């Protein structure tokens, strides 16, 4: 179903609107790197746009903070259907290091439906391009997804015998 959504939404190129919902800007720097001539994302038809009304894709970095929540919902509604959401970076994927703080709601998927996750802190430009290329069907995914669960302290540091 998602592949047909991508084909319908992205017949020729991918118009992306990027927003930061409360991150440290590490992911933003990597997203900007993807657009430089060194990585040349435009060769894949990826173009950054200045308005969500022109976008096919919403690229979100950072954890969702309480202050940004109403604006993020309005932003999501402004993107025309069919819309695709990418969560970029550990904070957008699950809240990151700020997950349990007083002003953070968590990852983007706590608020909006997320179609694709690109983890990393920050994710390298190659990882961002790879994630988008997999989403577009330009390349096949070489790894199988694993169920994510937070490790307990006992799992991270087993007691010595």
Task: Briefly describe each language-model feature range.
Residues 57-58, 66-68:
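A contiguous binding-surface segment within folded domains or other stable secondary-structure elements
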Residues 22, 63-65, 91-93, 123:
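Short glycine-rich anion-binding loops that position phosphate/pyrophosphate groups of nucleotides
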Residues 93-109:
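Glycine-rich, charge-decorated loop segments at or immediately adjacent to ligand/cofactor-binding or catalytic sites
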Residues 1-53, 77-83, 104-105, 109-118, ...:
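Iron-sulfur (Fe-S) cluster-binding modules
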Residues 85-87:
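Structural beta-sheet core signal
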Residues 67-80:
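Amphipathic helical hotspot of TIR/SEFIR-family domains
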Residues 69-71, 96-98, 128-129:
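Short glycine-/acidic-enriched loop or helix-start segments at secondary-structure transitions
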């Amino acid at each position: 179903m998602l592949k047909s959504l991508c084909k319908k939404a992205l017949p020729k190129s991918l118009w992306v609107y990027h927003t930061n919902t409360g991150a440290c800007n590490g992911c933003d720097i990597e997203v900007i790197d993807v657009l430089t001539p060194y990585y040349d994302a435009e060769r894949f038809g990826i173009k950054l746009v200045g308005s969500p009304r022109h976008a096919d894709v919403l690229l979100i970095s950072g954890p969702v903070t309480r202050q940004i929540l109403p604006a993020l919902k309005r932003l999501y509604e402004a993107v025309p259907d069919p819309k695709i959401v990418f969560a970029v970076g550990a904070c957008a994927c699950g809240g990151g290091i700020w997950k349990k703080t007083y002003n953070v709601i968590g990852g983007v998927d706590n608020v909006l439906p997320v179609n694709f996750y690109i983890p990393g802190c920050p994710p390298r430009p190659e990882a961002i391009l790879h994630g988008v290329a997999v989403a577009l069907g330009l390349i096949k995914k070489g790894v199988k997804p694993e169920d994510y669960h937070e490790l307990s302290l006992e799992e991270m540091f087993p007691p010595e015998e």
